[in-house]
Amino acid sequence: TAKIRGWDYFKEGDIYFVNDSYFTGTHLNDITIFAPIFWKHKLVGFSASRAHWLDVGGKDPGGSMDSTNIYQEGFRWPTTKLYENNKPNKEIIEFLKINGRFGYSLEGDMNAQIAAGKTGEKRFKSIIDRFGLDLIHAARDEIFKQSEELERQAVKDIKDGEYYAEGFLDDDGLGSDPI
């Protein structure tokens, strides 16, 4: 989202959701809700959660194993503001509720994810207050450094060349041929 819209798109008090499979890499029932975290008016991170919603308006509640295209799975949303300046976007929320079979459940799932995000924000800010942003950045950088070193160790003995692999699923739910 930042790549597409820029970092200035994120504002204090805003909460976003997205379920676009081509963006998130999961099916449409997996909803990501996230919010920027600001500390002293500076963007310092994000809180996020992903949850499987029972129904997002697809042909079958819970997901469709026999769908042949994405439009049968339900509504597909790019990153969209659920809240702006700490106020819910009632039109978007109502649209979500009326396009699913279980609007009350959808709203409950959404509110649970928002509460989880607010808890994450509160705890992250308490860590910043306790240790300071410089130490948190140093710890993050050290984690990245150690991860890179371990990755390089893992591949250093692999000889140069071309490698390939094949994989199969049992079937696609529409037939019995391996895919």
Give the label of every model feature segment.
Residues 43:
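Glycine-rich acetyl-CoA-binding "A-motif" of GNAT/NAT acetyltransferases
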Residues 24-30, 56-57:
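Short, Lys/Arg- and Gly-enriched loop/turn segments at beta-strand edges
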Residues 7-10, 26-28, 39-40, 69, ...:
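Solvent-exposed alpha-helices and their adjacent loops that cap or buttress functional pockets
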Residues 54-63:
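A short, polar/charged loop-to-alpha-helix boundary motif
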Residues 1-4, 37, 57:
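Feature captures the catalytic cores and cofactor-binding loops of soluble hydro-lyases/lyases
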Residues 76-151:
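N-terminal leader/propeptide and maturation segments of large enzyme subunits in energy/redox metabolism
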Residues 1-24, 128-179:
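Gly/Pro-rich turn-and-neighbor structural signature
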Residues 30-40, 48:
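A short, hydrophobic, proline-anchored segment that marks a local hinge/packing element in signaling
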